[in-house]
């Protein structure tokens, strides 16, 4: 599954948020300037953060799962955490 988010956070901020969020949950598998990869018992996950026109960053989170799994729930939760870095008052309401 692929999940997308557009944010005003910088690519560096997004990747630091990913390290904090996934670092205690999954094993790091890959790290480049704009991409992080993780793996665990639930599957593989990659996060990429690319500068987009203007002041935005395009965030893509991809899992190797075909349907909504526990890993996909983590991916969606992470995107809400990215949103919270820009808007600290953001309240996460999803059941993930």
Model feature map: region roles:
Residues 1-28:
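Terminal, regulation- and interaction-focused segments at domain boundaries
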Residues 17-18, 34, 92:
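A general marker of short, structured functional hotspots
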Residues 41-96:
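Beta-strand/loop substructures that line and gate deep hydrophobic ligand-binding cavities in soluble
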Residues 2, 35, 59-62:
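Conserved short-loop catalytic and cofactor-binding motifs
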Residues 30-38:
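Short, hydrophobic/aromatic-rich segments at coil-to-beta transitions
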Residues 20-21, 37, 77:
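Intrinsic disorder/low-structure terminal segments
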Residues 9, 13, 30, 46, ...:
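Residues in flexible loops and secondary-structure boundaries
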